[in-house]
From Swiss-Prot:
The family this protein is said to belong to: Belongs to the AccA family.
Subcellular location: Cytoplasm
Protein name stated in the entry: Acetyl-coenzyme A carboxylase carboxyl transferase subunit alpha
Species assigned in the record: Helicobacter pylori (strain Shi470)
Pathway membership: Lipid metabolism; malonyl-CoA biosynthesis; malonyl-CoA from acetyl-CoA: step 1/1
Record's subunit section: Acetyl-CoA carboxylase is a heterohexamer composed of biotin carboxyl carrier protein (AccB), biotin carboxylase (AccC) and two subunits each of ACCase subunit alpha (AccA) and ACCase subunit beta (AccD).
A GO CC annotation given for this chain: acetyl-CoA carboxylase complex
Length: 312
């Protein structure tokens, strides 16, 4: 059963009317209602607030990494473990083909249903997850395979065990190693891009965001709690943080925005998956045609800013 957000109530009402028209066999009414539905969808989705975009990024029906992997990756083989400690189910790694192009895919998976969400730790990776991702990145480099990364996490897992096993070191190591990989890397934020948990698999030649995704250093709720000690300030925090694709593109922090189906990826995962596939193939061609893509990646990362230590 489809889940509708509060601002989608009119869409839900029209959709219910369409279903009743189908039951009655009234094709004329169905056609009129479908046109009305298209008009309502365009009206609502062309005037979304940043808070509503946040709601869409977290929509329960939004496609997750495994949904996209199942739809676009053929002849796939999943790889497990980090060769150090454990296999983190919040990070999934596959070898396969996208339109006959051999590729390594790394994704953050939130899981569906209570049992699967617990298995996936709600998409919050432990250090072994990031080390698993790095293992696969090095595999891709060894066999000259491009890498597609699908980012979707509220953040790295903040538990005591994760910190004891070197959460910050694992993330920092990924930032360092992914920056110098000698193969094309393409990262797409498909839902939530939360803090270092997202950055750990977001250093790439091309960094794109789905139209209704977010990318932030902290959750808006966390920001509101820290700055104002008031959860009701979440919408104010969202505007101040500039977490939407449009804001981040204007700031030069991402390369591209991938448009979603008119009703959002959560209403048409097949079209959304195809759009990601086409973006990956186009971006890959562009990178492969550039003999200086490694230098360009370095310059792009350096243009984001630098950290300087002083003894004074």
């Amino acid at each position: 059963m489809a889940i509708y957000l509060d601002f989608e109530n009119h869409i839900k009402e029209i959709q219910n009317e369409i279903e009743l028209a189908l039951i009655r066999g009234d094709e004329d009414a169905k056609e009129i209602l479908e046109k009305r539905l298209d008009k309502e969808v365009k009206s609502i989705y062309s005037n979304l607030t940043d808070f509503q975009k946040l709601q869409l990024a977290r929509h329960p029906d939004r496609p997750y990494a495994m949904d996209y992997i199942d739809l676009i990756l053929k002849d796939k083989y999943e790889v497990f473990g980090d060769r150090h400690y454990n296999d983190d189910k919040a990070i999934v790694c596959f070898i396969g083909k996208i339109d006959n192009v051999p590729v390594v895919v790394i994704g953050e998976e939130k899981g569906r249903g209570t049992k699967n969400k617990l298995l996936r730790n709600f998409g919050m990776p432990n250090p072994c997850g990031y080390r698993k991702a790095l293992k696969m990145a090095k595999f891709a480099e060894k066999f000259n395979l491009p890498i597609l990364m699908l980012v979707d996490t509220a953040g790295a897992y903040p538990g005591i065990g994760a910190e004891e096993r070197g959460q910050s070191e694992a993330i920092a190591k990924n930032l360092q190693e992914f920056a110098s990989l000698k193969v094309p890397t393409i990262s797409v934020i498909i839902g939530e891009g939360g803090s270092g948990g997202a950055l750990a698999i977001a250093v790439a030649d091309k960094l794109a965001m789905m139209e209704y995704s977010i990318f932030s250093v902290i959750s808006p709720e966390g920001c509101a709690a820290i700055l104002w000690d008031d959860p009701s300030k979440t919408e104010v925090a969202i505007k101040a943080m500039k977490i939407t694709p449009r804001d981040l593109k204007e700031a030069g922090l991402i390369d591209d925005i991938i448009l979603e189906p008119s009703k959002g990826a959560h209403r048409d995962k097949f079209s959304a998956a195809n759009t990601i596939k086409e973006y990956f193939l186009d971006a890959l061609r562009t990178i492969q045609q550039d003999p200086h893509f490694l230098d360009n990646r370095y310059q792009k990362l350096m243009s984001l800013g630098s950290f300087v230590e002083s003894m004074n």
